[in-house]
């Protein structure tokens, strides 16, 4: 039996039974008793399946049915929409309204209601069959749409996985409803499912095509942007390299990069001139060439000032001049008295921004007063006693961790040693006598390897020692290490047992090199260090010393909880540092064993011309003799 036939049957039954229905307003019959109402509800619950929405209304309502309630839920919302013409639909809707009521308030007879329920059960079966038909139709639509979208998906699968997902999403049918939602919406969905299927398949094809085109455009744009970014990264990398070079080398790096950039500007200008027909830019070329020459001259001044060749910039851009060679080979090396830390002296305050470093800068009272005030503030927040004990118990451990993290890359090779200490230069000459050099606190070999590299003395023996085992390993494992002349061992200068380093006999060392090592010892270790140092030095030997000076920029910059005691600090990595004055250094070394040869303070003003900053650095340098 079809749905249309069922509706017609409902209409005929309603006409036949219309006279039997009594209007409560006109006849004023009393309502059914409670027992009859209960029996009616029991019959309803047993006879009507719960899947049909109409049953729920009759189970929860009394016999008297309000026409307004029935109007809110007409039967046509619960029945599937048949594929019939418009006239059948209108007739069906009219008959359904008649089933519910014949007037404003209809009193339904129990027998009539049971007959109606039996017919409606038949309608529920039809509804179930129509639901199954709609599910089958939906599955067929899904298969059709999937079949349409599959070729596009295969094309787009090679390009991008996201396209495949979008095509699949476009071709898939709508999500399944729950049973109650399906019963409520089945009529509307059946009427439009064919149209939706066609639209879905069309959208799948259009979506896959549009996504393919948009994805291809995006990929092309990404490639273009990536090329641009790579070009910018390369440019920035070159700038960063020149910047880092300038930071690591106070004088040479900045001017060398400036020279390179100035030369590049000249080259760029020449390229532009070729395209500027008839335009004379000779004046600009001459100006840039003059600027380049000035930068070259400044670079050569910096090289002479530092006393070393430039190995950080463009070697083709800056070549050594006769002035540089004569300065380093003639006037400076071999000169022992007095110390000469540099030649660039600041005579006029207005010239301070002309260079990035000035030598022999005397501190005024204002600078000293500012440094003392900052140090007083540091004393208000010293290192706690518990932490102080940890830092002082095993200082070698913190230096070992330091070299584990930084390896040999932290400090630069000290190529200025043979200029500031000509005795080292004399010891490495080919015609020099047999000599033993002992570097204490060798670290990663930044002093050891420059001496070994320049050595021409077949009778030279150089020993490197450090109390950090990892530092000694770095020296031994370096490609520059030459066991023919060099030896490396672990040794603590302030060891309380007075043990000598491995491979060193008592009073066998001619020159002891102490470059930035003595500052790592605590003041209560100085006396023991002097005893051990005296044991290894020959009579007539020398001690070469350089370390941090009092009021140095690094001392003034220390923050809270860093000061251990006067002029003695702990860094953030746990390593300790002391800042010496000439008076304190003289007191330590000449107290018992050694004689003062010379002591000097290297004061230098570093200038950040871009940020207009002045930074005062201070180092103490000395040579001590061992009595005969």
From Swiss-Prot:
Keyword RNA-binding listed? The answer is no
Task: Write down the chemical reaction(s) this protein catalyses.
Answer: cytidine(32) in tRNA(Thr) + S-adenosyl-L-methionine = N(3)-methylcytidine(32) in tRNA(Thr) + S-adenosyl-L-homocysteine + H(+); cytidine(32) in tRNA(Ser) + S-adenosyl-L-methionine = N(3)-methylcytidine(32) in tRNA(Ser) + S-adenosyl-L-homocysteine + H(+)
Top-rank EC class of the record's enzyme: transferase
**Skewed-composition ranges (Basic and acidic residues):** 1-18, 32-42
Under Gene Ontology molecular function, one entry of this record is: protein-macromolecule adaptor activity
Biased composition range(s): Acidic residues: 53-62, 132-146, 173-186
Please provide, in alphabetical order, the Gene Ontology terms of the cellular component aspect for this entry: actin filament; actin filament bundle; cytoplasm; mating projection tip
Signal sequence range? none
Which residues are recorded as modified (Phosphoserine)?
93, 321, 326
Key words, A-Z: Actin-binding, Cytoplasm, Cytoskeleton, Methyltransferase, Phosphoprotein, S-adenosyl-L-methionine, Transferase, tRNA processing
Task: List every position bearing Phosphothreonine.
Answer: 150, 347
Q: Where in the cell is it found?
A: Cytoplasm; Cytoplasm, Cytoskeleton
Entry's SUPFAM superfamilies?
S-adenosyl-L-methionine-dependent methyltransferases (SSF53335)
Q: What is its EC number?
A: 2.1.1.268
Q: Which InterPro entries match?
A: Methyltransf_12, METTL2/6/8-like, SAM-dependent_MTases_sf
Per the record, where are the segments of Polar residues compositional bias?
Answer: 22-31, 196-207, 231-240
Residues binding S-adenosyl-L-methionine:
399, 403, 441, 466, 492-493, 515
Q: Which Gene3D superfamilies match?
A: Vaccinia Virus protein VP39
- What is a biological process (GO) this protein takes part in? viral translational frameshifting
Q: Where is this region: Disordered?
A: 1-106, 124-269, 302-331
Where it mainly occurs, coarsely classed, is: cytoplasm
This protein's assembly is summarised as: Interacts with SES1.
Its job: S-adenosyl-L-methionine-dependent methyltransferase that mediates N(3)-methylcytidine modification of residue 32 of the tRNA anticodon loop of tRNA(Thr) and tRNA(Ser). N(3)-methylcytidine methylation of tRNA(Thr) requires the N6-threonylcarbamoylation of tRNA (t6A37) by the EKC/KEOPS complex as prerequisite. N(3)-methylcytidine methylation of tRNA(Ser) requires the formation of N(6)-dimethylallyladenosine(37) (i6A37) by MOD5 as prerequisite. Methylation of tRNA(Ser) is also stimulated by SES1. Binds F-actin and shows weak F-actin cross-linking activity.
Misc remark for this entry?
A: N- and C-terminal domains are encoded in separate ORFs that are translated into one protein via a +1 frameshift. ABP140 mRNA translation follows a cotranslational transport: mRNA is transported to the distal pole of the mother cell, independently of the SHE machinery, and follows a translational coupling, in which ABP140 mRNA is tethered to actin cables via its nascent protein product and is transported to the distal pole by actin retrograde flow.
According to UniProt, the name of this protein is tRNA(Thr) (cytosine(32)-N(3))-methyltransferase
This protein's species is Saccharomyces cerevisiae (strain ATCC 204508 / S288c)
